[in-house]
């Protein structure tokens, strides 16, 4: 068992934001994914107040010691997330952690209150 901010988790492994698309994985593997879900909680891709296309290519640069990426947080925006993604994410068998990003304190507050 593990605990994160007062939430009990089955184990200490959760995905990093944007690294695992649970909706696409469920389409590929069906409900079997829910029976053997690999993470103790699911962290969404970043949700912003308004939809974002993300950065134009190139989005990835190779360096001698690794890679730098600048994807630009493409997402459907709050309304799109609530209508399209949240119902699917809410059906996952683990706690949901929504990653939000605002361009002002007011936007962050609006996003946080939308999920509170």
Model segments located where?
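N-terminal capping/small domains of soluble enzymes
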Residues: 1-95, 102-103
